[in-house]
């Protein structure tokens, strides 16, 4: 496990913790030395000033991929986001090969993350899988999550499938979302990513207050697509 701070609880199976800043290419490479798989989940997880997103998400991912190239790591799993396609309409079941329509600067940073993964797969032969992660929560707590929820159980299943995908997989992008009845995104092709999600947010619909209807003509991102969601992160 690699993090900027020491976790409050030790990792499972007596794993080793490395305290590393993703902005430091030398220490990233040192920490990854000897690994054969990398699950890269680090970065700024939501809308923020663009310089912060570029530094953590884009430059940090570049350091991970470059370390993988230099040390001979076989597979890199990159955490992308559903926010890469947040401006597609809610009524459209979106697939991973459709054009990016990011709903904010965070989504833009994840478009760049995927592009870096594609570059390192095409140019340097790394095996790279990008998972466009849904709303990762213990249970859905707001109306949009009825479409976007990713349960902990399904998250583990997707990650395991990505790590064990055939070695012939050079580059793959897939949505990591539970099998929600109202989902916006296509589930992965089982021939590419061998996992079938099992949890459905609809089982929790009665627990969520408010109007649960989704405007089919509105953006999948919902409130994240509003101008103010990005503008409030401007620096003075």
Language-model segments: what does each one mean?
Residues 173-174, 179-196, 207-235:
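Conserved C-terminal active-site "lid" loop/helix of NAD(P)H-dependent oxidoreductases
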Residues 63-103:
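Conserved Rossmann-fold NAD(P)-dependent oxidoreductase catalytic core, especially the SDR/UDP-sugar
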Residues 101, 123-146:
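Flexible, glycine-rich beta-alpha linker
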Residues 55, 89-128:
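Catalytic helix-loop patch of NAD(P)-dependent Rossmann-fold dehydrogenases
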Residues 133-139, 149-171, 179:
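Alpha-helical substrate-binding/gating segment
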Residues 4-6, 11-24:
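Rossmann-fold cofactor-recognition segment
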Residues 23, 52-63, 71, 82, ...:
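Glycine-rich NAD(P)-binding loop of the Rossmann-fold in SDR/ketoreductase-type enzymes
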Residues 20-56:
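NAD(P)H-binding glycine-rich loop region in Rossmannoid oxidoreductase-like domains
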């Amino acid at each position: 496990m690699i993090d900027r701070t020491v976790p409050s609880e030790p990792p499972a199976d007596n794993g080793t913790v490395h305290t590393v800043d993703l902005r430091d290419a030398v220490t990233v490479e040192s920490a990854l030395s000897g690994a054969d798989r990398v699950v890269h989940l680090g970065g700024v997880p939501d809308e923020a000033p663009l310089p912060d997103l570029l530094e953590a998400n884009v430059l940090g991912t570049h350091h991970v991929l470059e370390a993988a190239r230099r040390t001979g790591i076989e597979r890199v799993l990159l955490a992308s986001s559903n926010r890469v396609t947040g401006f597609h309409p809610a009524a459209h079941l979106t697939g991973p090969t459709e054009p990016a329509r990011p709903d904010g600067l965070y989504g833009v940073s994840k478009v760049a993350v995927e592009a870096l993964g594609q570059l390192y797969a095409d140019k340097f032969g790394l095996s790279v899988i990008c998972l466009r992660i849904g709303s990762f929560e213990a249970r859905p707590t707001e109306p949009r999550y009825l479409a976007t929820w990713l349960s902990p159980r399904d998250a583990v299943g997707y990650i395991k499938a990505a790590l064990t995908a055939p070695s012939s997989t050079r580059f793959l992008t897939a949505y990591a979302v539970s099998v929600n009845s109202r989902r916006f995104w296509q589930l992965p092709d089982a021939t590419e990513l061998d996992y079938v999600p099992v949890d459905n947010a609809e089982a929790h619909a009665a627990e969520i207050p408010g109007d649960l209807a989704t405007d089919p003509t509105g953006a999948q991102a919902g409130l994240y697509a509003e101008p103010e969601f990005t503008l409030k992160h401007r620096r003075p």
